[in-house]
Amino acid sequence: MSRIGKKPVDLPAGVSASVSGQTIEIKGPKGTRAFKATDDVTLTVEDNVVTVTPRGKSKRARQQWGMSRTMVANLVTGVSEGFKKELEIQGVGYRAAMTGNTLKLNLGLSHDVDYTPPAGVTVTAPKQTEIVVEGIDEQLVGQVAANIRQWRKPEPYKGKGIRYKGEFVFRKEGKKK
């Protein structure tokens, strides 16, 4: 029995949901998102509450039950509040700046890195050492933040690089003479 799947998903004010077949569409103030569930679960909407129930007792149905409920909850959070990932840059001469829709990163490489985010995600640089990634799709926001971080991961000796805000970087001691 899935403890996560048993919980119903409440729809906040201003958010509506409609089910057609195995697809649920959630509309909110920040946009519209849809999710197609597998045939192992049933989606129902009653009184601003979305419930997910398994269609059988197979292991796959129980796995999809909790996963589908979490996906629906993420859709509701995305269209009502949105998702946000914050990155910080540490290192001498490491900078970020926005030029139009393109993020320009100066990371000590022989060239500047230009990154254009995909549709549905907004990237801003409030300071030269901060990057904010926002959007309604949690997976896409996380992937864009990971792609930006990939250009210069934090190194363990001085801690230079791009890291998530609040991320702990394991530090190593240098060679001893």
From Swiss-Prot:
Spell out the protein name for this chain.
Answer: Large ribosomal subunit protein uL6
Q: Which GO terms describe its biological process?
A: cytoplasmic translation
One Gene Ontology cellular component annotation held by this UniProt entry: cytosolic large ribosomal subunit
Q: Name one Pfam family in it.
A: Ribosomal_L6
PANTHER family xrefs: 60S/50S RIBOSOMAL PROTEIN L6/L9, LARGE RIBOSOMAL SUBUNIT PROTEIN UL6M
Per the record, the similarity remark reads:
Belongs to the universal ribosomal protein uL6 family.
What is the name of the gene encoding this protein? rplF
Species this chain originates from: Roseobacter denitrificans (strain ATCC 33942 / OCh 114) (Erythrobacter sp. (strain OCh 114))
Report the superkingdom from the record: Bacteria
Give the keywords, sorted. Ribonucleoprotein, Ribosomal protein, RNA-binding, rRNA-binding
Work out whether the entry's keyword set contains RNA-binding. Answer: yes
Gene Ontology MF terms: rRNA binding; structural constituent of ribosome
